[in-house]
From Swiss-Prot:
Homotrimer. The keyword Metal-binding applies. Coiled coil: none annotated. It holds the Pfam family Hexapep. CDD domains: GT2_GlmU_N_bac, LbH_GlmU_C. It is found in: Cytoplasm. Pathway: Nucleotide-sugar biosynthesis; UDP-N-acetyl-alpha-D-glucosamine biosynthesis; N-acetyl-alpha-D-glucosamine 1-phosphate from alpha-D-glucosamine 6-phosphate (route II): step 2/2; Nucleotide-sugar biosynthesis; UDP-N-acetyl-alpha-D-glucosamine biosynthesis; UDP-N-acetyl-alpha-D-glucosamine from N-acetyl-alpha-D-glucosamine 1-phosphate: step 1/1; Bacterial outer membrane biogenesis; LPS lipid A biosynthesis. This is Bifunctional protein GlmU. Mg(2+) binds at D103, N228. Catalyzes the last two sequential reactions in the de novo biosynthetic pathway for UDP-N-acetylglucosamine (UDP-GlcNAc). The C-terminal domain catalyzes the transfer of acetyl group from acetyl coenzyme A to glucosamine-1-phosphate (GlcN-1-P) to produce N-acetylglucosamine-1-phosphate (GlcNAc-1-P), which is converted into UDP-GlcNAc by the transfer of uridine 5-monophosphate (from uridine 5-triphosphate), a reaction catalyzed by the N-terminal domain. GO terms for molecular function: glucosamine-1-phosphate N-acetyltransferase activity; magnesium ion binding; UDP-N-acetylglucosamine diphosphorylase activity. Binds 1 Mg(2+) ion per subunit. Residues 1-230 are annotated as: Pyrophosphorylase.
Length: 454
């Protein structure tokens, strides 16, 4: 019985990135490059997926949680050597093997499937994913025979002047008959400018044996882009951002200026939501339908319900329920839970705070480590004083309470249901339900305190 296998090459050090971070772990739209590739592969029915790792292997293993197998390439001796490291997993298997690069984050499942379909339809032993490159510098060239058949692939550094003029390039993605692949790998030599074992040499070896070699030429060179330095990383980021934004617009999201709008690969956005220019949706954020996200807003790994309005604010690792309004210039820090129809206004900071339905925290307020009930009014300049220099303490404000402007609530403290705190109070003890608490000195006016002749 024939199987389908995938090998993802992710062992390169990536010295041109000039980074301490392992190359394939550099993010594109918030997700590591290699994870983009694995996600696309996982959409197809492969019996086994192997990721070849070397430098930073443990970090790659931590990043990828799919059911895949990791193969160590102890020395980076070329792409042919990398695939050969998976011999113990695949060599005895009948079927088709797709080889992809872990630094090609734009590759899609649709293109991989077309490559495999072409391979199987032609009864080929190897099929190369190729593309037309206006500037083929750095790419391996696809050399074809008189009948248009693929004869071999020549790396840029080893190409002749005539071969360098060829614009059809090897993208680094292949489909092989699995048994033929590993038989040919045993014959690959490292007699080249780099002294490495090149996977493309398998094409020439199979062709010399009279085997059928085919090619599938994609019309999207950008999809096959390999990322080797920060310039290419920025180009991949721009292409992925464009793809993501256009997909959300097709699904009913209004993006006023796609060029200045960032949406992570893991985000989800509901229909009829409007994103203004200079907005950033990071991580696995979920934004409901009919929301308005105005300029200058950053939403990071947060969940927004339906009809939420956010203006020039930051919301991180928190939940905002239906119909609530945030900002301008509010900061919703991790662990906060904002209920339905809540108003969190300008220059308000929440941290590990829950705000009940219909409550208002409108101006210049800090609410941290707090539980605020429903229909509560928190006045301007209120501070929950939660830190004693060593430990954090909780403030509880129950349903219907009113906290006057300029009040300090010294935690741990509880404000009872429908209780009132007078403006300017410093509350150190619990306030009973329906009570009025005034915790400030009486006003004393000193007549003639300032002499008239001063």
């Amino acid at each position: 019985m024939s199987g389908r296998f995938a090998v993802i090459l992710a062992a390169g050090q990536g010295t041109r990135m000039k980074s301490k971070l392992y190359k394939v772990l550099h993010p594109v739209c918030g997700k590591p490059m290699v994870e983009h590739v694995v996600d696309q592969v996982s959409k197809l029915e492969f019996d086994k997926t192997a990721v070849i790792v070397g430098h930073g292997a443990e970090e790659v293993k931590k990043t990828l949680t799919e059911k895949i197998e990791f193969v160590m390439q102890p020395e980076q001796l070329g792409t042919g050597h990398a695939v050969k490291c998976a011999e113990h997993l695949l060599a005895s298997q009948k079927g088709t093997t797709v080889v992809l690069c872990g630094d090609t984050p734009l590759i899609t499942a649709a293109t991989i499937k077309k490559l495999m379909d072409t391979h199987e339809a032609n009864g080929a032993k190897a099929t190369v994913l190729t593309a037309h490159a206006p500037d083929p510098t750095g790419y391996g060239r696809v050399i074809r025979g008189n009948q248009g058949q693929v004869e071999k692939i020549v790396e840029h550094k080893d190409a002749s002047v005539d071969e360098l003029a060829i614009a059809e390039v090897n993208t680094g993605t292949y489909c092989f008959d699995n048994e033929a692949l590993f038989e040919a790998l045993a014959e690959v030599k490292n007699e080249n400018a780099q002294g490495e074992y090149y996977l493309p040499d398998v094409i020439g070896i199979l062709r010399q044996k009279g085997e059928t070699i085919s090619a599938y030429q994609t019309d999207s060179l950008s999809e096959t882009m390999g990322v080797n330095d920060r310039v290419a990383l920025s180009q991949a980021e721009a292409a992925m951002r464009k793809r993501i934004n256009e997909e959300w617009m097709r699904q009913g999201v209004t993006i006023i200026d796609p060029q200045t709008t960032y949406i992570s690969a893991d985000a989800s956005i509901g229909q009829d939501t409007v994103l203004y220019p200079n907005t950033s949706i990071k991580g696995p954020s979920v934004i409901g339908e009919d929301c308005v996200i105005e300029s200058g807003t950053e939403i990071a790994s947060a969940t927004l319900g339906r009809g939420v309005h956010v203006c020039s604010s930051v919301i991180s690792n928190s939940v905002v329920a239906d119909g609530s309004s945030i900002g301008p210039f509010a900061h919703i820090r991790p662990g906060s839970d904002v209920g339905e129809n809540v108003r969190v206004g300008n220059f308000v900071e929440l941290k590990k705070a829950s705000i009940g339905t219909g409550s208002k925290v409108s101006h210049l307020t800090y609410v941290g480590d707090a539980e605020v009930g429903s229909d509560v009014n928190v006045g301007c300049g209120v501070v929950t004083v939660n830190y004693d220099g060593k430990n954090k303490h909780k403030t509880i404000i129950k349903d219907g309470a009113f906290v006057g402007s300029g009040s300090n609530l010294i935690a741990p403290v509880e404000i009872g249901e429908r209780a009132f705190v007078a403006a300017g109070s410093t509350i150190t003890d619990d306030v009973p339900s329906q009570a009025l608490s005034i915790a400030r000195s009486r006003q004393v006016n000193k007549d003639n305190y300032v002499k008239k002749d001063v």
